[in-house]
Amino acid sequence: MIFLGYAVTLGYVFFLIFALGPMVQKHANTETSRKLIHTGLFLVWVLIDVFFKDTVHQIIIPVIFIVLNALSYKYDLYKSVERDTGNHKGTIYFAVAITAVMGAAYFVHELYYPSGIAAFCLTFGDGAAALIGYNTSTRKLRDGKSVSGFLGCIASSALSLLVFRAVYPVSVSVPAVLIVAVSAAVLELVGAGLDNFSVTFGSFFLSWLLINYESHAMLIGMGTALVIFFVVFFSGSIDYYGALLSMVMVFCFYYFGGTFGLLYLLSTFFTIFFVAVVRKRLRPELKKEKSRRFIQVLINGGLGCLFVVLYGLSGELRCLVISIVAIGGCFVDSLSSDVGVLSRAKPYDPLKRRHVESGISGGMSRLGTAAALIGSALIGLCTALALRLTAAEGLLVFALVFLQTLVDTVLGSAVQVKFSCPVCGCVTEKKEHCGKPAAYLSGVRFIDNNWVNALSSIIITAAALLIFKNR
């Protein structure tokens, strides 16, 4: 039986590579040939299930393909699976990813069917994304990935997983299947060959989670997180990896913080989003901001996310309050800056006792300060009412949230690095200005705006931890 399994499995793969691939390549192109082979490899998992389930051979089979693909990568043995534009390690990554999940399934039996779901997402979903994207002309998202390929990945993954669900004994609902399929498409955008890992490991973990712990709360949290990814990524407000992190945070705030946690996080985000739209309309001459990056999302939401998870695990209300303060402080600081730039008057630096140019850290405007006060007051009031805090505790939340804006201002003025442009003479926080390297002016050289935001968030979160330690 084992010998027959090897003969059938290897024979099928060699048929794809040496017969089907060259035939398709002759009548179409190399990319179509590559991805048809890629998609056809779904049957390898099916054959492993028939011949090698729960034996070490389920690992040996993909290991063989690691060796063969590595040799092909080095010596260009399989013309039907190597790109015309040069060798890429994607075929090796494919085999390594499948080996990893099959190895995990060998040692932990409950991971067996998640390994199959991962294999189907990688073969059908990733394969369809490339085939459709390569042969259609639609908007590019990132790294050459297109909207049509993205939608094709969702559809192909969903259909293949519905078939998988019907054939194999896996207890996942249709909504759960759709969540895994959409998540696979989101992770496929990683690109550069690394999508072989992201799609495989992501769908592997999600399917294991949903098979064992599916609940309405989990489905709602994951569904909402995916919607937020679409909003922030497709609007260009946050870059790809920042959007992925935002997605994780949204899920954590709902799953561990409940409805209040989710509504609180979403209200802060959409307020900033709305202010950005209004600012663009009222002051179109202002320079367009770049998409927020992963590090900025981590700084603004990392501590808040950590404490909301601790709240969900421990049930201690103080953890939720600290999370609200951590998120609220970063939100109000951003709100103050975004609203403040609408002021026609120059911001005032209270530490240096002089006016500074708009956009330079350390400056405060009346308009921005008023926005910070209003935002902090609303957070304090809503938190006190929703969590049934005392009036004194609500005032402490208000004070801590607003205090972060002041701490950020002081640090921005005192320690954030600033430069002088040799061309126009203006003070800037960028190392280059007017196309020339800027000269160091003041501050600590390695402390930029991200450092200032992180330090102010840590200080306020630590203060909240001390103040509410007995709550």
Model-derived features: positions:
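Viral RNA-dependent RNA polymerase
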Residues: 79-87
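Hydrophobic alpha-helical transmembrane segments
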Residues: 1-79, 91-336, 340-471
